[in-house]
Amino acid sequence: MSADERFPRGARLLRRREFEGVLRAPEWRTANRYFRVSARQNQCGRPRLGLAVPKRVLRLAIQRHRVKRIIRESFRVRQGGLPDHDFVVGVRGAVAEADNATLFSALEELWAHARGRPCDGS
């Protein structure tokens, strides 16, 4: 596994203020049936990921963990082609009934949308 394919701590949003910065003033948002993504340019020089998978949407821990693993893996594989933005991925109710392949496909659509956005300020 090359360095670009890893998912280190620096590629994650960990603090509340990092999440709030993206969610309160996103540069853009997009969504599909399963996920919603808010994004904002960062100064880190790399894309970073934050997850919002609430118990209110997925009641069972095993469901929440499965969805989080899928989101992280999809981001890890695609992060080399993404702009230097902070991404917060939230889930929608339909995610509970979807299989893994469907979720990966839905995330790929969202990452493709992110790659197609113009990078501001550079």
From Swiss-Prot:
Q: Which keywords does UniProt give here?
A: Endonuclease, Hydrolase, Nuclease, RNA-binding, tRNA processing
Q: Which GO terms describe its biological process?
A: tRNA 5'-leader removal
Question: What does it catalyze?
Answer: Endonucleolytic cleavage of RNA, removing 5'-extranucleotides from tRNA precursor
**Pfam families documented for this protein:** Ribonuclease_P (PF00825)
What name does the UniProt record give this protein? Ribonuclease P protein component
**Entry's InterPro entries?**
Ribosomal_Su5_D2-typ_SF, Ribsml_uS5_D2-typ_fold_subgr, RNase_P, RNase_P_CS
The scientific name of the source species is: Halorhodospira halophila (strain DSM 244 / SL1) (Ectothiorhodospira halophila (strain DSM 244 / SL1))
Could you tell me the superkingdom of the organism this chain comes from? Bacteria
Q: State the gene name recorded for this protein.
A: rnpA
Q: Name one GO cellular component term.
A: ribonuclease P complex
Which Gene Ontology molecular function entries are recorded, alphabetically? Answer: 3'-tRNA processing endoribonuclease activity; ribonuclease P activity; tRNA binding
Q: What PROSITE patterns does the record point to?
A: RIBONUCLEASE_P
Family stated for the protein in its record = Belongs to the RnpA family.
The subunit structure is: Consists of a catalytic RNA component (M1 or rnpB) and a protein subunit.
